[in-house]
Regions:
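Small beta-barrel nucleic-acid-binding modules, principally OB-folds
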Residues: 42-60
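A structural signal for short, hydrophobic beta-strand segments that form beta-sheets
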Residues: 47, 68-70
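HotDog/MaoC-like acyl-thioester-processing domains
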Residues: 54, 58-63, 70-145
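Short, positively charged
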Residues: 35-36, 42-44, 62-64, 81-83
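Hot-dog-fold acyl-thioester-processing enzymes
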Residues: 2-47, 104-145
């Protein structure tokens, strides 16, 4: 499979891969819901919906930063938005908004966050909300607050 497509720019699947590996995985680790949690507590998140924009094309070897620009949660769901910024030229290359569920992997069913995780997420919101971007959010109505 080619990382560069016939239009001579980065294939769309690699935008998603970068958001997943360098954005979502990082957030899940901060909130103690990542790979370690999946293996030890059998609880993790599963993405159920996403909305991605391709704002300016990237070339194959371009370096980018991925930043979380919005985050919220209810008792069972996470909503977050990330931006992909060209490292050198500082342009917005892409955004993704995610709706994910917290899942008990033994039961394969949605479950509620433990108090420890709620505390970590609320602290993250408190520390970062002044930098959040609230415009064009697609999934806010899906949180049950």
């Amino acid at each position: 499979y080619k990382r560069q497509d016939y239009n001579d720019h980065m294939n769309v699947s690699y935008y998603l891969l970068m958001f997943d590996k360098y954005g979502a995985d990082s957030l899940n680790n901060i909130f103690k819901m990542g790979e370690h949690s999946a293996k030890t507590t059998k609880k993790s998140t599963m993405i159920v919906e996403s909305h991605i924009t391709y704002d300016q094309e990237l070339q194959l070897d371009d370096e980018v930063d991925i930043n979380c620009v919005y985050f919220d949660h209810d008792k069972k769901r996470l909503q977050y938005k990330m931006e992909m910024i060209h490292k050198e030229k500082k342009f917005l290359a892409s955004t993704i908004e995610i709706l994910a569920l917290y899942v008990d992997l033994n039961e394969r069913k949605v479950t509620e966050f433990e108090e420890e995780k709620i505390k970590i997420m609320d602290e993250f919101i408190s520390n970062n909300k002044s930098k959040f971007k609230y415009e064009n959010l697609k999934f806010s109505s899906k949180l049950k607050k």
